[in-house]
Curated annotation (Swiss-Prot):
The lineage of its organism: Eukaryota, Sar, Stramenopiles, Ochrophyta, Bacillariophyta. Keywords: Chloroplast, Electron transport, Heme, Iron, Membrane, Metal-binding, Photosynthesis, Plastid, Thylakoid, Transmembrane, Transmembrane helix, Transport. This is Cytochrome b6. The keyword Iron applies. Its main location: plastid. It comes from Thalassiosira pseudonana.
């Protein structure tokens, strides 16, 4: 094992990286309330793992979507547990995100020089809500269908750009297969990719600037 470590150390200087990570200064005022952001990230990882597992069985079709979810819940080994964890973790992620935003705001973590960290966090909040909106409709049951219809119809009230935006979201004049395909693509590819990039940017800025001091 020592030879393997020495091989990597010679090429990547892993010890220097480990020392940099472990020696990062943590202000003495930091307490348990500063863990909300980390919990959000943990929930995101759980969402990725459980969501990926369900993609093996879920079918994004208006005909088969509900039946495939029912199959996951009743026939797939531990499918009920995986989907339940996915739902519970989604709720936990939103709740922890709200608490994280309040904590950052109340402790002044958005002030100079951390404005960009705050901006990326706000965008991440929008992405998180978008996860909920798109995922809610994927079972394509009565609740999911009407939720999708209402959500995609909201932009119609916006002058000029509203109606074209509705067409883009729905993939046509009415809610149907094209809408479900768009929601599935957004939920499983577009939003996770955006979240990963934004989280990396968010973490790098926190790493660079450190945790804000007490008020």
């Amino acid at each position: 094992m020592g030879k393997v470590y020495d091989w990597f150390e010679e090429r990547l200087e892993v010890q220097a990286i480990a020392d940099d990570i472990s020696s990062k200064y943590v202000p003495p005022h930091v307490n348990i309330f500063y863990c909300f952001g980390g919990i959000v990230f943990t929930c995101f990882l759980v969402q990725v793992a459980t969501g990926f597992a369900m993609t093996f069985y879920y079918r994004p079709s208006v005909v088969d979507a509900f039946a495939s979810v029912e199959y996951i819940m009743t026939s797939v080994n531990f499918g009920w547990l995986i989907r339940s964890i996915h739902r519970w973790s989604a709720s936990m992620m939103v709740m922890m995100l709200v608490l994280h935003v309040f904590r950052v705001y109340l402790t002044g973590g958005f002030k100079k020089p951390r404005e960009l960290t705050w901006v990326t966090g706000v965008i991440l909040a929008v992405v998180t809500v978008s996860f909920g909106v798109t995922g809610y409709s994927l079972p394509w049951d009565q609740v999911g269908f009407w939720a999708c219809k209402i959500v995609t119809g909201v932009p119609a009230a916006v002058p000029i750009v509203g109606p074209p935006l509705v067409l883009v979201l729905r993939g046509g004049e009415s809610v149907g297969q094209s809408t479900l395909t768009r929601f599935y693509s957004a939920h499983t590819f577009v939003l996770p990719l955006a979240a990963a990039v934004l989280m990396l940017t968010h973490f790098l800025m926190i790493r660079k600037q450190g945790i804000s001091g007490p008020l």
